[in-house]
A protein has these predicted regions:
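N-terminal active-site segment of His-dependent metallophosphoesterases
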Residues: 1-71, 149-152
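Low-complexity, intrinsically disordered short peptide segments enriched in small/polar/basic residues
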Residues: 2, 140, 154, 214, ...
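Hydrophobic residues at beta-strand termini and immediately following loops
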Residues: 8, 132, 213
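His/Asp/Glu-rich metal-coordinating catalytic cores
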Residues: 46, 58-209
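Binuclear metal-dependent phosphoesterase catalytic core
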Residues: 120-123, 207-222, 226-227
Length: 227
């Protein structure tokens, strides 16, 4: 049974710049989540990377490939890794070209790393991942069909990499109502988002109380734990 989900997005690994700094931060992150998850079994942990693992679309380098695959391999030792693509991981205007994540997945050939590319519902133990795939224009998966197939006793978690109406950027720009509305995620119990680098949180149905300790963690840049 999955008991803990670690959520990160917008890693933006460059082709060769700042790799020493990236690796130092990655190692700190891995050490932190390893300590946090020490009371969980490997199969109880999921690490969700919600788009933009790399930065320069399909321009990749040997250095980038080495660092990216090292990061994914180390994460997979903590728990199963779930990845979706973001706008920096592919050419949106030419999807016939291979994206930058696929070669890593093929080379790693790791059963503890899953790469979801379709807008559909993926069963994973007691969780159903509802992927709004960028390869299919962030189309809403058929969550109703997924619930009929997999049951309502699962937790349905959306994966989405694109702006949301009402989200704000670090410079204060707010995305207007022409962008995706929260009802696009109807049927999901929660949604893990990527793309906008300023951390935001939306509550569509009921308000969640956050204690002071949680709030201080939430305000920081970095990663989030969902239990």
């Amino acid at each position: 049974m999955i008991k803990s989900v670690i959520h990160l997005a917008d890693v933006h690994i460059r082709t060769y710049r700042m790799h020493d700094e990236y690796k130092e931060i990655f190692q700190t992150f891995i050490d932190e989540i390893t300590e946090y998850c020490k009371d969980y079994k490997h199969e109880e942990i999921r690490i969700a990377i919600v788009g933009d693992l790399v930065h320069q679309k399909i321009t990749i380098s040997n250095e980038q490939l080495i660092l990216s695959t090292w990061f994914l391999r180390e994460l997979s030792k903590v728990g199963k890794v779930v990845i979706i693509a973001g706008n920096h991981d592919l050419l949106e205007n030419n999807k016939d070209r291979v994206d930058s994540i696929s070669p890593m997945i093929e080379l790693l050939d790791n059963p503890h790393i899953a790469y979801y590319q379709e807008s559909t519902c993926y069963l994973d133990d007691n969780v159903v991942w509802c992927n709004y795939s960028i390869f299919e224009g962030n189309e809403r998966p058929d969550i109703e069909e997924g619930r009929a197939k997999h049951g309502d006793d699962k937790t349905y978690i959306g994966l989405y990499h694109a702006p949301i109406a009402g989200a704000s950027t670090d410079v204060g720009y707010i995305f207007d109502d022409n962008h995706t509305q929260l009802n696009h995620f109807d049927g999901c119990d929660m949604v893990l988002l990527g793309d906008i680098h300023k951390r935001s949180c939306f509550y569509n149905v009921e308000r969640k109380e956050i204690d002071e300790t949680e709030l201080e963690i939430y305000k920081k840049n970095g990663w989030v734990i969902d239990e």
